[in-house]
Amino acid sequence: MPFKPLKLSVIAMVILYAVLMIPVTSWLNLLSMLFVRNAFESSQSELTQNALWVNMIVMAVIPPICEEFTFRGLYYNGYRQRGVWCAILGSALAFGLMHMNFNQFCYAFVAGIALGILLEATGSIFATMTAHFVVNGWSTAL
């Protein structure tokens, strides 16, 4: 598993990459809601009862670490011997399915592809954790 440290310039590019992912994933979520009601929206009201810092830890810090370790670490590396695209698509598919509903699958699968490409480009799981944190943190803060 690539735990290569990141230069400050790479971190800045990763943050920009993540910010550019946000409109794409938002659009896919909206598109998916044409077919199926978003199941996650109903549970979001429960989150508003917590302090923002609690929500940030629960939604934007812990999941990126655990999910990136699992999907871009274990799954990606398991599929990598079959080729880059098998690793990217296989880990993205597992990442999408883990979200367990159609709406989240749609954007999580595409985000998983973007994160797999980011892992391949940077060679560091810290890059995918950072990008995942930015995306989750953005939606949690809003």
Region spans (language model):
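Juxtamembrane helix-loop-helix connectors linking adjacent transmembrane helices
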Residues: 1-69
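Hydrophobic alpha-helical transmembrane segments
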Residues: 11-15, 53, 57, 85-90, ...
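Hydrophobic alpha-helical transmembrane segments of integral membrane proteins
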Residues: 12, 16-21, 93-108
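Aromatic-enriched alpha-helical transmembrane segments of multi-pass intramembrane proteins
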Residues: 48, 84-86, 142
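Active-site His/Glu-centered metal-binding helix of metallohydrolases
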Residues: 65, 69-70, 74, 101, ...
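Membrane-interface helix/loop boundary segments of multi-pass membrane proteins
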Residues: 66-90, 117-124
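Functionally important transmembrane alpha-helices
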Residues: 92, 104-142
